[in-house]
Amino acid sequence: MALFSKKDKYIRINPNRASREKPQAKPEVPDELFSKCPGCKHTIYQKDLGNDSVCPNCGYNFRISAHERLNLTVDENSFEEMFTGIETKDPLNFPNYQEKLALTREKTGLDEAVLTGTASIKGHKTALGIMDSNFIMASMGTVVGEKITRLFEYATEHKLPVVLFTASGGARMQEGIMSLMQMAKVSAAVQRHSAAGLFYLTVLTDPTTGGVTASFAMEGDIILAETQALVGFAGRRVIESTVREKLPDDFQKAEFLMEHGFVDAIVKRGDMRDTLATLLAFHGGQA
């Protein structure tokens, strides 16, 4: 009675016939090959950003290092670095601070969060400072304050204009009150430079916040800013909880500050060198 015979409820497979090949691993894509734009959220092929690291879709300015900015700004081989080798005394003996400094120096190739020296911008000699957010968020400690102060003192003595690219997360907490003192210290040097009739120009880059904003970043004779740069003192949430109001979406953006008279002009990164040269030519080093 084959009609009612039992059948196996499973299928027999010869194990020798089964494929024993391991699934192929997916090809690895290098992390540095693509970047996601914080502005338009598009994924961008790294080469499409160009040398100035600007999003080709929305114009967002990616953060760049001090040396990258130096190459975009000054005449070739004109930069002479000054005030190197200054080290913090670590006044609070803050845990792991010295180790963090050592690792950051190795990673960035900088001795501190600001690069200082003299350079020419289309033939105009200037004292130049560039803060780098890759170095502990360009927080302002005693060495940063000392280097910028010395830069202004040198510029005053040699009758040079000062161009300073600012970027900072604020005062460096690992140095306590000593970091806050740098606000007044640098501002005093700025005032002496100004009293000598010399020209000081600041360029606010993303982010410029905290004590740097509350002092020398906003003391320039002319204040420029990069597109969509975050500029402010306290954080947005702190302000909203204090005033108990919802702030505008573009609050603390460079465009908002220019609209309210705190910034003189917003300059595209690709136009910055020409703009600086023009302003230096207009002023001739004099304010």
Curated annotation (Swiss-Prot):
PROSITE patterns named among the record's database cross-references: COA_CT_NTER (PS50980)
Signal peptide: none
Binding site for Zn(2+): C37, C40, C55, C58
GO CC, any one term: acetyl-CoA carboxylase complex
ZnF start-end (C4-type): 37-58
Domain named CoA carboxyltransferase N-terminal: residues: 33-287
Pathways per UniProt: Lipid metabolism; malonyl-CoA biosynthesis; malonyl-CoA from acetyl-CoA: step 1/1
InterPro entries: AcCoA_carboxyl_beta (IPR034733), Acetyl_CoA_COase_Trfase_b_su (IPR000438), ClpP/crotonase-like_dom_sf (IPR029045), COA_CT_N (IPR011762), Znf-ACC (IPR041010)
Keyword list, A-Z: ATP-binding, Cytoplasm, Fatty acid biosynthesis, Fatty acid metabolism, Lipid biosynthesis, Lipid metabolism, Metal-binding, Nucleotide-binding, Transferase, Zinc, Zinc-finger
Source organism superkingdom: Bacteria
Reactions mediated catalytically: N(6)-carboxybiotinyl-L-lysyl-[protein] + acetyl-CoA = N(6)-biotinyl-L-lysyl-[protein] + malonyl-CoA
HAMAP family the record matches: AcetylCoA_CT_beta (MF_01395)
Summary of the function given for this chain in its UniProt record: Component of the acetyl coenzyme A carboxylase (ACC) complex. Biotin carboxylase (BC) catalyzes the carboxylation of biotin on its carrier protein (BCCP) and then the CO(2) group is transferred by the transcarboxylase to acetyl-CoA to form malonyl-CoA.
Assembly, per entry: Acetyl-CoA carboxylase is a heterohexamer composed of biotin carboxyl carrier protein (AccB), biotin carboxylase (AccC) and two subunits each of ACCase subunit alpha (AccA) and ACCase subunit beta (AccD).
Family affiliation: Belongs to the AccD/PCCB family.
PANTHER family assigned to the protein according to its UniProt record, in alphabetical order: ACETYL-COENZYME A CARBOXYLASE CARBOXYL TRANSFERASE SUBUNIT BETA, CHLOROPLASTIC
Name of the featured protein: Acetyl-coenzyme A carboxylase carboxyl transferase subunit beta
Organism: Streptococcus sanguinis (strain SK36)
